[in-house]
Amino acid sequence: MGFNVIRLLSGSAVALVIAPTVLLTMLSSAERGCPKGCRCEGKMVYCESQKLQEIPSSISAGCLGLSLRYNSLQKLKYNQFKGLNQLTWLYLDHNHISNIDENAFNGIRRLKELILSSNRISYFLNNTFRPVTNLRNLDLSYNQLHSLGSEQFRGLRKLLSLHLRSNSLRTIPVRIFQDCRNLELLDLGYNRIRSLARNVFAGMIRLKELHLEHNQFSKLNLALFPRLVSLQNLYLQWNKISVIGQTMSWTWSSLQRLDLSGNEIEAFSGPSVFQCVPNLQRLNLDSNKLTFIGQEILDSWISLNDISLAGNIWECSRNICSLVNWLKSFKGLRENTIICASPKELQGVNVIDAVKNYSICGKSTTERFDLARALPKPTFKPKLPRPKHESKPPLPPTVGATEPGPETDADAEHISFHKIIAGSVALFLSVLVILLVIYVSWKRYPASMKQLQQRSLMRRHRKKKRQSLKQMTPSTQEFYVDYKPTNTETSEMLLNGTGPCTYNKSGSRECEIPLSMNVSTFLAYDQPTISYCGVHHELLSHKSFETNAQEDTMETHLETELDLSTITTAGRISDHKQQLA
């Protein structure tokens, strides 16, 4: 009995000693499971944006998810992920990986998602993905792939989505996807593919979405896709497709959306192009080179509920009438920006409005509506009643003569009314723009506006001041006095060399004074014997002429005085010159 008690006590002591050791071992293994600089959430390890050049070796063996995104990994070595046999998803995108060993993914058979996008991979060996047969999602987009091996995806029977977007692929091998029987999404967009073989999609019986946009296809034959019996969405936008044909009589009942926008489609090869897709619901034909669509093509669009036709070069003639009538009866979604590209007079006008306003569909094929000029309205003379005895047979109608109906007048009034509204709106907007400019300049530069106002006020004040000065000053008056001396004064002047001369005052701003000269100069001088003195000066009166001797010793003194209304004039004595001669 005592021995048993001692043995129990010793066993409990051993357990107490072993328990801390086990705990320390578990803690150390947990610490070893999360590498330095990484973030661990349960069994998920995130080593992102760490500039890693090698994959950490201290990752726990029970890791279910590993993210090594945004690092500097350059290659994947042999058995790179050995020991991580529980791994279900692996993210290696946005690295510098250019070389992958054929056996790099050995030991991770449970992997379901592998992301290798945005690297520098230029090729894969055929057996690269053989160890990961349980893959559901494989992303190889945004790399530098030039070609694919014929057995590149062999064995990937559970693959659901395959992304090969934005590479440099030119061709796709025949039957390369034959083992991908469960594939639902295939993205081959943004490559350089020019053509596809007829059996390239063999075995893809569950594919629902196919991306072939931004490639270099020039022709499209719907007979390439008879094996895609489950395809619902086909994207072929922004290629160089000019012709769409159908060389096989079959019904593609699964297709619901077809995107052909951004191509160079001018016409369809025949009315049976869309007859093989009776359940088509969405059709994109915008940004092509279509000028019209025939009635047979329109009749095959029996299930459409969404269509886009903008960005084409629609010719607004009678050929457009079938499309306009179809659009009017279409009850689904459509764009309203279907614009005429020709003729020149209708460029920029909505197709439906052009047909409605210009009666394009109401005219014969030989008659053209002249839109460059407005035709004058015809005037009709009232018919005078004929006498009953003058009954003449009716003249046959002239060929081509038509009487304008009431629709023409209504259309003209409608057009003129629109022009009036457009002109009024333009005038109103221009006035608003002017007012806005004035307001902004007043707010932005208040000092300059004040200076302009002050300058305008100064100009007004100066103008008013000039007008007041003109009213205050008297009008300029000039008098010409014809001075004729008497006989006694003439004889005295001849003998003595002197003679009296009278200066009269008058209201003017200028004055004239007589010139001093001798007798011979006086008799021979034919110009007025006057000169001009300073302005506003009053002259001395009764100043005589002097001889040459007296001129040397004598100076003419004039007493001046400022006066605004002074002018003195001297007469001319040309009559005496004539008498003496």
From Swiss-Prot:
Gene3D superfamilies: Ribonuclease Inhibitor. Expressed in neuronal tissues. It is found in: Cell membrane; Postsynaptic cell membrane. Residues 377-408 are annotated as: Disordered. InterPro entries: Leu-rich_rpt (IPR001611), Leu-rich_rpt_typical-subtyp (IPR003591), LRR_dom_sf (IPR032675), LRR_TM_domain-containing (IPR050541), LRRNT (IPR000372). The chain crosses the membrane at residues 420-440. PROSITE patterns: LRR. The gene is LRRTM3. It comes from the Eukaryota. Belongs to the LRRTM family. This is Leucine-rich repeat transmembrane neuronal protein 3. GO terms for cellular component: extracellular matrix; extracellular space; glutamatergic synapse; postsynaptic density membrane. Exhibits a limited synaptogenic activity in vitro, restricted to excitatory presynaptic differentiation. May play a role in the development and maintenance of the vertebrate nervous system. Residues 441-581 are cytoplasmic. PANTHER family: ANTIGEN BSP, PUTATIVE-RELATED, LEUCINE RICH REPEAT TRANSMEMBRANE NEURONAL 3. Residues 31-61 form the LRRNT domain. It is a single-pass type I membrane protein. Keywords: Cell membrane, Glycoprotein, Leucine-rich repeat, Membrane, Postsynaptic cell membrane, Repeat, Signal, Synapse, Transmembrane, Transmembrane helix. Residues 312-363 form the LRRCT domain. Residues 1-30 form the signal peptide. One of its GO terms (biological process) is positive regulation of amyloid-beta formation. Residues 31-419 are extracellular.
